[in-house]
């Protein structure tokens, strides 16, 4: 950064970065006149990761439950058959195959994903609630055009996260609180929203 002329660095008025304290310090030192904007990708990814963590917790519960049922069936000398729900999948399969649909906007779901999501949300209302929180955050980024409007909606979202009481969302709420002003700066910039597909990791349980 210091290889850039000092005068040129001082002309930079805006810089987009992640939530790293190191990057914050570097940006402040190298671009003292630039307004810092937290890249919305990092905020949205925190929320998506928290949602997936909740799904994974339930998946392990389903795996353990199925393992116990299989063992009981073996001890009783009967054949084990896992219950299949109306979309033709077992509880464990639903939780495993729901990974990608939870990264998407519901409008982008195909028929099979819509059926799977319907069953998933009936079985796990907490996943449905967490999914709604992620979607609300995306709408804040896509709809707010002023700091005042963004502040109001983000504050409401922050309160909803706290009221939901999801352990996996604690780090999301803490990060939003810690970087509040720099997150709100997104509403004064023209940086485009990254599509949900870019939030999908290449591999995840």
Residues covered by each model-derived region:
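Acidic/histidine-rich catalytic cores and adjacent linkers
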Residues: 2-32, 45, 64-205
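Short, surface-exposed linear patches
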Residues: 36-40, 58-61, 69
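Short, surface-exposed amphipathic charged segments that create phosphate/polyanion-binding patches used
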Residues: 48-59
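Inter-helix linker motif
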Residues: 33-49
């Amino acid at each position: 950064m210091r290889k850039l002329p000092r005068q040129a660095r001082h002309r930079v008025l805006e810089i987009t970065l992640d939530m790293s304290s190191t990057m914050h310090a570097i940006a402040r030192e190298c671009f003292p006149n630039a307004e810092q904007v937290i890249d919305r990708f990092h905020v949205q990814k925190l929320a998506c990761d928290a949602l997936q963590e909740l799904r994974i917790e339930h998946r392990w519960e389903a795996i353990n439950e199925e393992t116990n049922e299989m063992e009981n069936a073996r001890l009783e000398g009967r054949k084990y058959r896992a219950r299949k729900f109306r979309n033709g999948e077992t509880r464990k399969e639903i939780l495993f195959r729901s990974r990608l649909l939870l990264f998407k906007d519901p409008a982008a779901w195909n028929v099979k994903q819509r059926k799977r999501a319907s069953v998933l949300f009936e079985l796990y209302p907490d996943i449905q609630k967490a999914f709604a929180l992620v979607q609300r955050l995306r709408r804040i980024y896509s709809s707010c055009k002023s700091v005042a409007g963004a502040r109001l909606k983000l504050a409401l979202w922050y309160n909803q996260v706290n009221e939901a009481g999801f352990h996996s969302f604690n780090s999301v709420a803490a990060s939003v609180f810690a970087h509040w002003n720099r997150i709100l700066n997104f509403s004064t910039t023209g940086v485009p929203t990254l599509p949900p597909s870019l939030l999908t990791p290449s591999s995840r349980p």
